[in-house]
Amino acid sequence: MRTRTVDREVQGPWSLATSREFWEGFAPAALGGHSEPDTLSTTYRVEADWSCADATVTQHEDTATIAVTGDGDLDEAADQAARFLALDVDARGWIGVARRDPVIADAQAQLPGLRPCGFHSPYEAAAWAVLSQRLRIVQAARLRAEIIDRHGDRGAFPGPAQLLRLDLGLPGRKGEYLRAVAAAALDGQLDGAALRSMEPEQAVRAVRDVKGLGPFGAELVVLRGANVPDGLPTHERRLDAEITERYGPGRTLTEVSAAWRPFRTWAAVHLRALRERRTHEIDRQSRGLV
């Protein structure tokens, strides 16, 4: 295997430590606890050729050092790592959202330097959207982990060509829908760079063409899988509840999010992260308390 190391200047606030802590608690695809101190390490499928790559990221002030190791296209692997960590976003205007919205100012203060992360690609986000249908998050996370243990590569989710061939014995139409996701990924319908180049609403409509992906799943693929910074998750009931709690009864997501542009996704992720920190809704599910 070969290694490629890239230094990338990060524009705007970023904390590797905060982002790593967020990802480690991200229930759908939690980051493993194998990273060394002051680093973030993860293994993933590279969209360009579906090879497997290991990435190790460190921070030196406003510079991210991304070291990728694998047998495939390492330039693409490094670019993808920058995207799934949101290091490719010019966030110098993020502080302006805080000036316009005191709720987001508080969120930024509590999660200093957080940049949304979690899914390595739209393909993995789409697979999660299928696996989590009609299941609790913790149940779906266990199912995903079992698939990786049995069919993955060094901890990475199976590539789409392999997923097409697998008979996972999943309930309902999950197997059919996963194969549709795999076929779409191979056809380029779930390409992260392509989805990022579209307007978010257009990208969501395009993803809706994939069998098995409804409105919530399509938004997840675009906003969290492609890591689009300025989209609006309109099918997130926990976010809606947080809007009511933070902004008051009668206030709507559409109304309050006008002040969040061009970082609506980021603001929504911050509010959801703080809600989980406060309520432990998902964690309580994992411990069988709800």
Task: Specify the residue positions occupied by each region the protein language model found.
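HhH-family (HhH-GPD) DNA N-glycosylase catalytic core used in base-excision repair
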Residues: 1-290
